[in-house]
Design a protein with these regions (language model features):
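C-terminal catalytic domains of large/alpha subunits in multi-subunit enzymes
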Residues: 2-231
Length: 231
């Protein structure tokens, strides 16, 4: 993106300052025609003259190479790891359920900001909780999706948050790839930790139903689906 921005600024300099000399950007200054102006001044002047200062592009992750025919290769730059243990309770009469406690440890590499990372882990788990316990998808007979927005399916709220929500960052995490601070992505991977909630609900159904029918519980494990499985 920086290349395209700089090209646009260069064209602006040529036109606005009536020059065709070589342009040099260095230490927050711009040099041309034996002139020196601050980069801030250039940006402000360009902005006031309605010069677009944004650009877009595509990023291609390095080292990714997968043969779709043989299914061999490297699908990801690196992996993140995590573990979660979830404790749940279910009501045998209604199918309602509640997460009592979740304990998570997650690998974020060499963390840049542990507070932000912890928040991302918590958010990813809750998002996955919605996927597996509340967000039921349905269609009409003609294939039209009826649950098309949060007004037509239930997303998790503060009420679905576990009573005890323990999150720890793996303090020996390290990314062998040359990325910023040797950190790891933490936005989406914790999403999968919520699978532990679904497995815990299946185990609860198994114990409540004397070992019967737990394999019939489908995701999302709504109160209705749990009740159907119990009876």
């Amino acid at each position: 993106g920086d290349v395209y921005k700089r090209q646009g600024l260069n064209e602006f300099i040529y036109d606005y300052f009536k020059t065709n000399s070589k342009i040099k950007y260095e230490n927050n200054f711009v040099y041309f025609d034996k002139r020196k102006i601050s980069f801030k001044e250039l940006i402000n002047t360009a902005y006031l003259n309605r010069i677009p200062l944004s650009s877009s592009g595509f990023y291609k992750t390095d080292k990714i190479n997968v043969n779709t025919k043989t299914l061999q290769g490297r699908p990801f730059l690196y992996f993140t790891y995590g573990a979660a243990v979830t404790e749940v309770i279910i009501d045998k009469l209604t199918g309602e359920n509640k997460i009592l406690q979740v304990d998570i440890i997650h690998d974020v590499g060499n963390s840049i900001n542990k507070r932000i990372d912890k928040g991302q882990i918590e958010g990813g788990y809750i998002q996955g909780l919605g996927w597996l316990t509340t967000e039921e998808v349905s269609w009409k007979s003609n294939g039209v999706l009826t649950t098309h927005s949060p007004s037509t399916y239930k997303i998790p709220t503060a009420g679905e948050t576990p009573f005890k929500f323990n999150v720890e960052i793996y303090d020996r995490g390290f990314n062998k790839e040359k990325v910023i601070n040797r950190s790891k992505a933490v936005g989406e991977p914790p999403f999968m930790l919520a699978i532990s909630s679904f497995i815990a609900l299946k185990d609860a159904v198994y114990n409540a139903n004397k070992g019967k029918n737990s394999e019939n519980l489908i995701a999302p494990a709504t109160a209705e689906n749990i009740l159907k499985t119990l009876h």
